[in-house]
Amino acid sequence: MAVVTVLSGCIKEKQTGADLKVGDRLPDFEVVMSDGETVTDQILQESVSVVMFFHTSCPDCQQVLPQMQSVYDEYAPKGIRIVLISREDTEESIESFWQEKGLKMPYSAQNDRKIYEKFAATRIPRVYVNEKGGIIRYVFTDDPNPSYDEICTALENVIR
């Protein structure tokens, strides 16, 4: 007899944080990116933005991150802010994963859940597409993982 286990997200988690939805405003936060830039919710209100939470050992995140690099390559030159924030991940593991996958986009290594819990309680990857002014217009989780095309379509809809 076979036993099948269905997992919710990469890791079974207890709900402890916020659960931002479409129409909500980005919460107050500040992170320092790997390129030294400080990003805040106030800065993200100045343009269309994408915020993604990830962990490098999460299989779903491992699938989505290379797609996010393609999104970054296409939209960052157009002034769209793409902000990747780790959840309980180390700078070393992120650097190693970035090098292994050939990723170039900046990220913010967070070794705890303080920033993540301002956005969500459970599930990664988690991708927020936000309009100018900091209002969330799309939320993608691992149910199912967002594709490159879905993220681009969301961005195009918000840009219009």
Question: Would you name each region that the model predicts?
Answer:
Residues M1-V6:
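Bacterial N-terminal signal peptides
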Residues L7-D28:
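N-proximal helix/coil linker or "cap" segments that precede and/or mark the start of modular domains
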Residues E30-S49:
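A short beta-strand-turn-helix
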Residues S47-S49, F54-C58, R123:
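Short pre-active-site segment immediately N-terminal to redox-active cysteine/selenocysteine motifs
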Residues V50-V51, I82, V127:
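Hydrophobic beta-strand anchors of alpha/beta hydrolase catalytic cores
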Residues F53-S70:
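Conserved redox-active cysteine motifs that mediate thiol-disulfide chemistry
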Residues E95-G133:
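Short, internal strand/loop/helix patches
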Residues V129-R160:
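Thiol-/selenol-based redox modules, centered on thioredoxin-like
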